[in-house]
C-alpha cells in the first residue's frame, strides 16, 4: 500500500509532514489521499467533486449501536445492480435506502430463506445536481442481510 500511495501521489504516507494530495489522469480520473479522513472531510470532497455515493442510508433511522453497522457491497452484472446490505447490529433496522439512479423491477432477495419478493414501496427523488435516487424502505433484522437487485431505467 505504501508503494502504491508513493507512486500515485509522490509522497511517503509513513511520514507525518504532508497535506492532503490530489491527482488526476488524462482520462479525467481523479485520486484523493486525505491525511486525516473524517466523515466531514469526505463529505466535503464529495460535494466539491460533485460525487454521489452508490448507496446512502437515512442515518436518523439507524439506532446508535456500540458494535455493528449497516454495510453494503455493490456489484453490477449483465445489466443489473446487486446490493448486499448487512445489519451487524443487535437490533432490527428500519431505514430508507437511497440508490443512485432510477431503478425498474426492484427485488429483495433473502439469502437466509431463498425468498425473492418484488419491492413495491419505492420512489424517485430528484437531486440538486439533476440526477435521481431511488428511495426504498427496508427492514433488516439484527445480524442478517438482504440483497436488493434491480435494473437501472434507461
What does each model-found stretch correspond to?
Residues 1-154:
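Carbohydrate-binding surfaces of carbohydrate-active enzymes
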